[in-house]
A protein has these predicted regions:
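Cytochrome P450 catalytic-core helices
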Residues: 2-19, 23-27
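Amphipathic, well-packed alpha-helical segments that form the structural scaffold of globular domains
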Residues: 8, 25, 29, 55-62
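Long, K/E/R/D-enriched contiguous segments that form extended
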Residues: 9, 35-38
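A generic secondary-structure signal for well-formed alpha-helical elements
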Residues: 14-19, 28, 32-35, 61, ...
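Conserved cytochrome P450 K-helix E-x-x-R motif and the immediately C-terminal K′/meander segment
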Residues: 38-83, 102
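Conserved cytochrome P450 K-helix/beta-meander segment immediately N-terminal to the heme-binding cysteine loop
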Residues: 61, 93-123
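Cytochrome P450 heme-thiolate "Cys pocket" and heme-binding signature region
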Residues: 81, 118-130
Length: 130
């Protein structure tokens, strides 16, 4: 089950890094208090660090290590005119390879929710997190 697996990995990482766990706990408590002690959709939407923690969990432990897509049109690989992906061909996108690329994610083995903050995301191409 994808949700329980993601949450299990998030809890594992938080157990290893108590400072991150404390920061998340403080955000949860403050946000719930701000929403009159009601845990609602709007309350969850205000938990920005929670979103970062879950996104980093999905980055480090992707449920689908690969994505499969079908080419909608012929595509010539830039710089390689003999490499053509024909319309209808299946293409494998290596999710884990993208998420563990040190050029995009320095220290990819490190659990670091800050790399998925709003400011950090603005500096990165949108296809660098799948």
């Amino acid at each position: 089950e994808t949700s329980s697996t993601t949450l299990a990995f998030a809890l594992y990482e938080l157990a290893l890094q108590t400072k991150l766990q404390e920061r998340l706990r403080q955000e949860i408590e403050a946000t719930i208090k701000k929403h009159n002690n009601e845990f609602t959709y709007e309350c969850m939407e205000d938990m920005h660090y929670m979103k970062q923690v879950l996104a980093e969990t999905q980055c480090k432990y992707p449920i689908a290590p690969n994505l499969m897509r079908q080419a909608a049109a012929d595509y010539v690989v830039p710089g390689h005119p003999n490499y053509v992906i024909k319309k209808g061909m299946m293409v494998t996108i290596p999710t884990i390879g993208i998420h563990y690329d040190p050029a995009t994610y320095p220290e990819p083995d490190k659990f670091d929710p800050e790399r998925l903050s709003a400011d950090a995301l603005r500096l990165r191409d949108s296809v660098d997190w799948l």
